[in-house]
Amino acid sequence: MQPTNTIEPLPDSPGGGGDPSQLRLEALGYKQELSRTMSLADVVVYGLIYMVPLAPLAVFGFTYNLSGGMVAAVYAVAAVAMYFSAVSYSEMARQFPVAGSVYSYVRFGAGEFLGFMSGWSILLDYLLLPGLLCIFAAAAMHLQMPALPEWIWVPVFVIVSTVINLRGITFTAGVNLACLYLQLAVLVVFVVAVIVALHAGRVELSWAPLLGHGAFSPALVFAALPIAVLSYIGFDAISTLNEEAKGGGSAVARATMIVLAAVAALFMLQVYLAALFVPSGTKFTGDSAVTAFYDISAIAGGPVLKAIVTLTSALIAILANAIVSQATTSRLVFSMARDRRIPAFFAAVDRRRKIPVRAILMVALLSTGIGLVAINSSDLITSVVTFGSLAAYCLLHVAVMRYFAGQRDRRRWFAHRISPLLGLAILVYTLWKTQELARIVGVVWLAAGAVIYWFRRRVAAGATTQEAPSPPWDDAPG
């Protein structure tokens, strides 16, 4: 496919027979290689697992410290901030039913260079996240088995995740559904324990988790926003299934909005209830910042509830997230390798199971290394992961505004202009609030990506290679 001078959005329904999603994929210059077997419910479950219904557990202590106790307010503001990103993802998912998600969306919406940079940026998130999740799981397991060192759990969780993903996407979807049910069941048990505590007078309802113990402070809420936003980062994982979802982009767009609404309600509920048990002026320090929610579970329902919540968080919630995270990362690596943006070696697909085996194994090895090296640096890795995601989301908003710039459909005016502009402004502010060291690491990573893109472009200019399908224009420098 050659670059064109027009940038018209794709039609809602391509002409002719056949699967509309496959026709759109072929119109973009790709062929269907992955197995399109996932229903809307499967995609929603996949998104819920990736975003983890119990996600606030692992970072509750950090969020509470930074927000001065206004944890519910932080997650509410984070939900509003990520709504604009969800709208942009939904719009681009309908236009480009391709597995690369933000990489593909920005590439086709704003050109080769920004597309590569968005993929490179989100790759920072994806390459670190599986290892980070193994660190969180190892910390939770160490609470239950202190005789075993934390690091020994890292390869265990990586191996389990890899074995499940190598079974294929259908098997992974089944495991995800079982894990989701278990997480929701544990959350119900925690809510019931809090209700019992309220009835017994051991704790009282309060506005403090929303408004603070003293005067409401927007500065404190925004200070904790980067950590809370990490819990909502899952839209890209959903859209990596564009070539495996029945209904393609339409199913992905619907799933994105459903998942955001569901997790926003779950996140706000659990952090609000947990914060009721924390006395005013409390500051979690050392290991207590990591185990804060687990310790609160013991106050609410005794040591049995603490053990249930801890084991569920480690063995079910975080493990399930690690499985999905590994699957998502491998799909992004596959997509970029297929486009020859990274070595094509990783674009190989197993003919029988229709999964990117080499990409999965590469992610597994990298996750093990990161988990072992950064076992005591989870707060920094968390901030770096957030930086990578938010930087990619910023480029997504730019792509939406640029791609739809010539469209005059007033019905989509909010989605194509106002929403991406607001989303971009909020994300830029949130990026500025991340840790200074995380910003430095992120900027260095992006600079390295720009150099790699420039170098590969120069090499490709002197050689004949298989080119990826071209976007509407190419704004690459030089």
Where do the protein language model's features map onto the residues?
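Membrane-interface "cap" regions at the ends of multi-pass membrane proteins
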Residues: 1-70, 82-87, 99, 208-209, ...
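Extracellular loop-to-transmembrane helix junctions
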Residues: 54-150, 157, 259-262, 268-269, ...
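Helix-loop-helix junctions that connect adjacent transmembrane segments
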Residues: 71-72, 149, 178-311
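Membrane-helix boundary/coupling elements in multi-pass transport proteins
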Residues: 98, 121-134, 232-245, 304-344, ...
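TM-loop-TM module centered on a large, flexible mid-protein loop between adjacent transmembrane helices
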Residues: 104-105, 111, 142-144, 255-325, ...
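Membrane-interface loop-to-helix entry segments
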Residues: 150-203, 218, 255-261, 385-395, ...
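C-terminal membrane-solvent junction of multi-pass transporters and transport-like membrane proteins
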Residues: 175, 346-353, 393-439
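A generic transmembrane alpha-helix motif of multi-pass inner-membrane proteins
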Residues: 385, 389, 414-478
